[in-house]
Amino acid sequence: MKVAVLGAGAWGTALAGHLAARHDTLLWARDAALIAGLQARHENSRYLDGIALPDALRYDADLGVALAHGAADDALCVIAAPVAGLRTLCHAMRDAGCVPAHIVWVCKGFEADTHLLPHQVIAAELPGQQSNGVLSGPSFAREVGQSLPVALTVASTSAGCRERTLAAFHHGAMRIYTGDDVVGVEVGGAVKNVLAIATGISDGLGLGLNARAALITRGLAEMSRLGVALGGRAETFTGLTGLGDLILTATGDLSRNRTVGLQLAAGRTLNDILGALGHVAEGVRCAQAVLALARAQSIEMPIAEAVCGVLFDGIAPRDAVSGLLRRDARAE
């Protein structure tokens, strides 16, 4: 199978390395200098340093070349750009006049200005594209790059997309499950990043494991309420892309969103934290969208609201936690 991976950040690079072990894989990025470095060293020293990439993996900075590769009869196109760049990439794909027949995206979050999920952006920008879906689940790029075990879910209303994604990714240490709840999978992948900031704050303040467990459990309830209101199914949020991804992102030391929370609790400013990370922390980008959607649906999401207060309203982390503890008692 031919596979084109659009986006050479940490996640796109790790997935391309996995795919290249079994398929004819091409990794694209618009940054020619990044591509030149990949071609010379077979390592993404900018985003995934120390991980050797397969010799068979190919690289190109020409989007037309990548799209032609991913549009072959027996091919799959993987969109690994962040949500913030998804619409622009779709524009470029449409302008290139070569939209692959089968597309799966791996980005997580809501579009900041519109509060749309990735599938809604793709439907608006690539209206004729019918075989598409989302691949998501509890996964750190570095561990995938190291070929450590991982389980992900592909969700699509197209059986052809599910089957092609399964055929592409299900090998080696990667196990793929299938489903059709695109909205539920996307909401889980977006909201868990916001909740991971909350657990990072709690852990950074030294509030203990009991508090962490409470935040994860009550955060899952918030995720599920919003997801169901937006059209997802409740059972999706207890699976890999909901609870599984939340546990990993909220507790794993490789989590950028958890790191943001830890650093906020230590008294660092958000600008300083993001500057030092050098990578995207999607929980920061989509926190306001999550809260806006919750309010539009008349849904209470007190943990997400507390995170927004710390990120954008100048509320001290300890005061935000105190506010959560002062909430009225109620039935679970």
Swiss-Prot record:
GO molecular function, one term: glycerol-3-phosphate dehydrogenase [NAD(P)+] activity
Pfam families tied to this protein: NAD_Gly3P_dh_C (PF07479), NAD_Gly3P_dh_N (PF01210)
Any GO BP annotation: glycerol-3-phosphate catabolic process
Primary enzyme class: oxidoreductase
Record protein name field: Glycerol-3-phosphate dehydrogenase [NAD(P)+]
Binding residue positions for NADPH: 11, 30, 108, 141, 256, 280, 282
UniProt-annotated binding residues for sn-glycerol 3-phosphate: 108, 137, 139, 192, 245, 255-257
Segments traversing the membrane: none
Disulfide bridge positions per record: none
Compartment(s): Cytoplasm
Gene: gpsA
Functional summary from the UniProt entry: Catalyzes the reduction of the glycolytic intermediate dihydroxyacetone phosphate (DHAP) to sn-glycerol 3-phosphate (G3P), the key precursor for phospholipid synthesis.
Alphabetical keyword list: Cytoplasm, Lipid biosynthesis, Lipid metabolism, NAD, NADP, Nucleotide-binding, Oxidoreductase, Phospholipid biosynthesis, Phospholipid metabolism
Species, as recorded: Burkholderia cenocepacia (strain ATCC BAA-245 / DSM 16553 / LMG 16656 / NCTC 13227 / J2315 / CF5610)
